[in-house]
């Protein structure tokens, strides 16, 4: 780590640049932690309020702002179990202010907009045209708002409705059965109602790569000064599904490393599905209601605790494989397309060394997924969660970062752009990468370019750093496929070629022990390398490992796939060894 004085200077420089370029869109993250512990509200709502009331360096103003935010949340935030109590207060007082998630829909038949309140449980509340026209996110999934409500049973309350001439409709012009006594007097979004992506591009130019990386990590709540460079890159990789369409990511690792934090707390555009049973109707398409499932409603669908994933439908995994490969799926007579990314996170209960020797790094997946090479081949990126430290209090930042809603929205805007071809100017991918490998690497490169260089300005060296990381993330998937599927996935020696020097450079994965086919030095006991022809006739290098474990003398094979001849050969060798064991010297 750098000396404290140098760190402080760097932090101050970053804070000053943030104030100059993103004033009103940054917040001190320790304030979020202070209030979040006692308030069950999304982080992005909390930080928007803090950004409004605590945008100062004066501790007195900040403290007053924190108290204001606490009062607003205590008095106005709607808890679902208190919805009827709040409606009763509204009826009694005639008006009340609430904080809730508001979604607006256009009723074509009645030619007017109606609002729905998520926690309050209200539906079909008329709303003036000016609000959805001014805040278009109300129509695109909804946003959190502070809403002043009125309760009026009689009179000429126009409920926000206007006729075709723009004049307020009178009560006599409306059917009483279609009306609710509740109306919206004023609505104020407490999320970013819209985003100016050019502001982000212009502001990015003021920062170096390392400074911008620190800003992005602090915006997610991490303290970059407690992380080494590789850990920073790995944590940024968690954001790739939010910035890339149809990106399939897997992260397996120890507990308490924050694997699901980003998908649950940081982005309002992603949903975390806890491990358990799910259905094709819920995830993809409900044929009865003719409605698209989660993949059509969210930018990212993350599955927590992958070991518990189970589809009630027999064709669930097949449909998921189709979607992960093409971004579309067929249900009934229709084919539907969606852009949601898929994320699989879970815990590894053994050390990585043990998993590599006895099974594969996909072992925590349920058997129908973890041994299906066609499913696993569709994963673009495998984050080595065991390299990320277990989070302690010092890993969470107290410094300035973007309001999470601002971060989430400009990341969402960047999903519309493509930078996967950025590497073609300087590099060419090696021959061992097939089409799926190439797509995966390009998606990872494109995602990192969007996160680190949203202004599109980067050097060859910076792009090479991203490319090496992308090749490693995809090769980790391919190495495990080779263990599960045998020589069908022999082409794992990923490389790239520099178009200036035509030098080919190979990229390995750290846990495999280097990039050579046969490592230098003596092999571990029970491990040998041999050269032979595979089933296709191609000559290849094979590594054989044997282990003796406590048990009943049963012989088990792993890593051979479904090749019957290969399994029979190992049985023959084992039986020969048993029959001639007394002739083998133990010394």
Q: For the regions a protein language model found, what residue spans apply to each?
A:
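Extended, charged/polar low-complexity intrinsically disordered regions
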Residues: 2-219
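Dynamic helix-loop-helix/coil hinge segments at AAA+ ATPase domain boundaries and subdomain interfaces
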Residues: 199-233, 559-567
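Helical mechanochemical/support elements of P-loop NTPase systems and associated helical scaffolds
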Residues: 208, 212, 312, 316, ...
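Conserved, well-folded catalytic cores of nucleic-acid-processing
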Residues: 219-223, 309, 323-327, 348, ...
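Conserved ASCE/P-loop NTPase catalytic core
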Residues: 223-355, 359-363, 377, 495-512
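Phosphate-sensing "switch" segment of ASCE/P-loop ATPases
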Residues: 335-342, 347-456
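C-terminal helical "lid" subdomain and adjoining coupling/linker elements of P-loop NTPases
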Residues: 393-395, 421-497, 502, 506-520, ...
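Conserved P-loop NTPase/AAA+ ATPase motor core
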Residues: 508-587
């Amino acid at each position: 780590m750098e000396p404290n004085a140098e760190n402080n200077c760097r932090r101050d420089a970053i804070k000053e640049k943030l104030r100059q370029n993103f004033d009103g869109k940054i917040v001190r993250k320790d304030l979020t932690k202070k209030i979040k512990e006692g308030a069950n509200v999304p982080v992005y709502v909390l930080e928007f309020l803090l950004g409004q009331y605590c945008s100062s360096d004066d501790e007195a103003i900040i403290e007053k702002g924190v108290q204001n935010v606490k009062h607003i949340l205590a008095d106005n935030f709607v808890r679902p179990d208190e919805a009827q109590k709040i409606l009763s207060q509204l009826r009694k007082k005639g008006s009340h202010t609430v904080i809730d998630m508001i979604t607006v829909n256009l009723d074509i038949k009645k030619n007017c907009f109606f609002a729905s309140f998520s926690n309050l449980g209200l539906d079909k509340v008329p709303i003036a045209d000016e609000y959805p026209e001014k805040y278009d996110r109300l129509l695109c999934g909804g946003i959190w708002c502070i809403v002043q409500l009125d309760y009026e049973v009689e009179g000429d309350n126009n409920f926000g409705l206007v006729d075709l001439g723009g004049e307020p409709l009178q009560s006599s012009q409306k059917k009483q059965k279609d009306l609710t006594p509740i109306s919206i007097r004023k609505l104020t979004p407490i999320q970013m109602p819209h985003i100016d992506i050019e502001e982000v591009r212009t502001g990015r130019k003021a920062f170096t790569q390392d400074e911008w990386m620190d800003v992005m990590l602090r915006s997610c709540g991490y303290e970059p000064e407690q992380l080494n460079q590789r850990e920073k890159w790995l944590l940024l990789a968690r954001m790739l599904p939010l910035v890339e369409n149809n990106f399939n990511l897997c992260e397996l690792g120890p507990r308490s490393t924050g694997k699901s934090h980003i998908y649950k707390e940081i982005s309002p555009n992603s949903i975390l599905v806890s491990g358990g049973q799910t259905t094709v109707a819920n995830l993809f398409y409900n044929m009865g209601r003719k409605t698209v499932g989660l993949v059509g409603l969210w930018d990212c669908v993350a599955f927590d605790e992958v070991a518990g994933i189970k589809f009630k439908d027999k064709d669930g995994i097949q449909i998921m494989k189709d979607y992960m490969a093409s971004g579309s799926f067929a249900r009934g007579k229709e084919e539907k397309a969606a852009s949601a990314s898929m994320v699989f996170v879970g815990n590894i209960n053994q050390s990585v060394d043990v998993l590599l020797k006895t099974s594969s790094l996909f072992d925590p997946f349920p058997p129908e997924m973890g041994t299906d090479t066609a499913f696993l081949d569709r994963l673009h990126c495998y984050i080595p969660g065991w390299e990320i430290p277990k989070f302690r209090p010092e890993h969470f930042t107290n410094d300035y970062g973007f309001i999470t809603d601002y971060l989430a929205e400009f990341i969402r805007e960047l999903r519309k752009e493509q930078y996967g071809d950025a590497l073609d100017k300087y590099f060419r991918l090696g021959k061992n990468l097939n089409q799926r490998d190439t797509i995966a690497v390009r998606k990872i490169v494109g995602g990192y370019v969007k996160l680190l260089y949203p202004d599109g300005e980067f050097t060859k060296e910076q792009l090479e750093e991203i490319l090496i990381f992308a090749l490693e993330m995809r090769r980790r998937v391919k190495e495990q496929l080779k263990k599960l599927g045998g020589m069908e996935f022999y082409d794992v020696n990923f490389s790239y070629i520099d178009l200036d020097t035509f030098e080919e450079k190979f990229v390995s994965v750290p846990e495999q022990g280097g990039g050579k086919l046969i490592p230098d030095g003596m092999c571990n006991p029970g491990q040998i390398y041999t050269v032979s022809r595979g089933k296709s006739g191609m000559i290849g290098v094979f590594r054989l490992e044997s282990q003796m474990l406590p048990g009943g003398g049963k012989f088990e094979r792993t890593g051979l796939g479904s090749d019957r001849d290969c399994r029979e050969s190992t049985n023959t060798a084992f039986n020969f060894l048993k029959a001639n064991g007394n002739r083998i010297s133990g010394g």
